[in-house]
Amino acid sequence: MVAGIHSLLLLQFYQILLSGCTGLVPEEGKRKYSESTRSSPQQSQQVLDQFELRLLNMFGLKRRPTPGKNVVIPPYMLDLYHLHSAQLADDQGSSEVDYHMERAASRANTVRSFHHEESMEEIPESGEKTIQRFFFNLSSIPDEELVTSSELRIFREQVQEPFKTDGSKLHRINIYDIVKPAAAASRGPVVRLLDTRLIHHNESKWESFDVTPAITRWIAHKQPNHGFVVEVTHLDNDTNVPKRHVRISRSLTLDKGHWPRIRPLLVTFSHDGKGHALHKRQKRQARHKQRKRLKSSCRRHPLYVDFSDVGWNDWIVAPPGYHAFYCHGECPFPLADHLNSTNHAIVQTLVNSVNTNIPKACCVPTELSAISMLYLDENEKVVLKNYQDMVVEGCGCR
């Protein structure tokens, strides 16, 4: 049961925020809201639940996420969020977000991350090779989303032992799509090479591999998902070089808290056909010089939505809240230029001055902008998504 103050805050949030979103709350819902202020606590809770469900649907969620306490947010997803929220620190060199990833996000408005299922057994080492099979459950990707790009990210640690710099200390990482799993009589699965990389042991960093063809085959073409094979080939026979520096599986000596931060990560970039891509900034109109106006006239008012106040901070990772603003005020006759009115609003206001049965023009948002949100979905998958029309940039009489 939601506490009384919590219910009031959430209902007020819906009333103000959704008042600027045409069609988001039907007239019946608005009537129920006004009636809820006079109804019993049980009826108020029902109205609250209906509002919450409608807003969750706007976010593309079927139910309110209830993530566990041990869910780890990949640092890479936080970097992406800060990048697209223009909140990165000046020193961007330490960020794992590179140009290639920014370009991938330029065609998407949604980024999803997936960890592999660790039930898969490691394929025994064969000579100079370490081979691991990975399976990622992608069932949480909605059918209406078009996956535009996908990356498999693997962490490699710097080798601490002294080594030569003549290029002999190299590993090759090959990523394969399992087209057909191994049959009982066959020697191994049928695979297709997706990407390959020659790496040195000289630094700790993430390596990104393009696996878009496999994800497209699984999602768009509805073909079976048998996972990937990651093959690490050691190009030298120096036993002093640890072969576990490429982190494709968890070692027994590794700290339990450290493994979730360096385990392999599959990242998909997709677009649901709504709004703009993540990297595209909607150009905001230049603010005109503020004219002296009546305090009661139509204008933008401050409204800060704090997700902890409405009880959503357990699944919304970032931002903790945002400035939504709202429009309120009179549209008096005659309509002044600074009220950003349409010709129809001017005519309607003129008619209202002689016939009060015709309502005045309304103070509504005339310009809205998007925000990026990083959250955990119903399946505890980390999602970064661009949501349109979340911030009021301008108001006018319409």
Curated annotation (Swiss-Prot):
Glycans are attached at N137, N202, N237, N340. Disulfide bonds join C298-C363, C327-C395, C331-C397. InterPro entries: BMP2_TGF_beta-like (IPR047953), Cystine-knot_cytokine (IPR029034), TGF-b_C (IPR001839), TGF-b_propeptide (IPR001111), TGF-beta-rel (IPR015615), TGFb_CS (IPR017948). GO terms for biological process: cartilage development; cell differentiation; ossification. Pfam families: TGF_beta, TGFb_propeptide. Keywords: Chondrogenesis, Cleavage on pair of basic residues, Cytokine, Developmental protein, Differentiation, Disulfide bond, Glycoprotein, Growth factor, Osteogenesis, Secreted, Signal. Residues 1-23 form the signal peptide. Residues 24-284 form a propeptide. GO terms for cellular component: extracellular space. It comes from the Eukaryota. Induces cartilage and bone formation. This is Bone morphogenetic protein 2-B. It comes from Xenopus laevis (African clawed frog). The lineage of its organism: Eukaryota, Metazoa, Chordata, Craniata, Vertebrata. The gene is bmp2-b.
